[in-house]
């Protein structure tokens, strides 16, 4: 059997008025008594998760970690945090589409 890593608790939140979903994963650290999180964004029609925040440390407990993660994502959304990543992703997709067009027309 291959060795696996427990990725802990994961939630997803659909961002209002967009085609994007944010995933947040949290792993509990016994050493610091905190959760270490990773934040990803994905457009619904593309299967690639894009890491946007790595190793945010969150003080919480097992019974409320999901709620606390949802609160964190909501706070970030209300401050416009995800706008940059959405704009960047849209730009990358346009560049990719243009590259495909160039390659297809070269043949």
Feature map (PLM): residue ranges:
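A short, compositionally biased
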Residues: 5-8, 31-36
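Short beta-strand micro-motifs enriched in acidic
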Residues: 25-31
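Negatively charged, low-complexity tracts enriched in Asp/Glu with abundant Ser/Thr
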Residues: 1-19, 25
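Mixed-charge, Lys/Arg-enriched low-complexity segments
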Residues: 48-107
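Short linear proline/tyrosine/threonine-rich motifs used for host-factor recruitment
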Residues: 13, 23-24, 35-42
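Short, low-complexity interaction segments enriched in Ser/Thr/Pro/Gly
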Residues: 11-14, 41, 91, 95
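Hydrophobic residues embedded in beta-strands of well-ordered beta-sheets
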Residues: 33-37, 47, 63
């Amino acid at each position: 059997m291959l060795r696996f890593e427990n990725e802990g608790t994961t939630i997803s939140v659909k961002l209002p008025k967009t085609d994007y979903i944010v995933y947040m994963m949290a792993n509990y650290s016994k050493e610091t008594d905190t959760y270490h999180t990773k934040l990803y964004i994905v457009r619904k029609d593309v299967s690639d998760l894009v890491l946007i925040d790595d190793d945010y440390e969150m003080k919480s407990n097992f019974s409320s970690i999901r709620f606390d993660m949802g609160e964190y994502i909501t706070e970030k959304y209300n401050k416009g945090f995800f706008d940059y990543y959405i704009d960047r992703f849209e730009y990358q997709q346009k560049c990719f589409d243009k590259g495909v067009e160039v390659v297809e027309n070269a043949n």
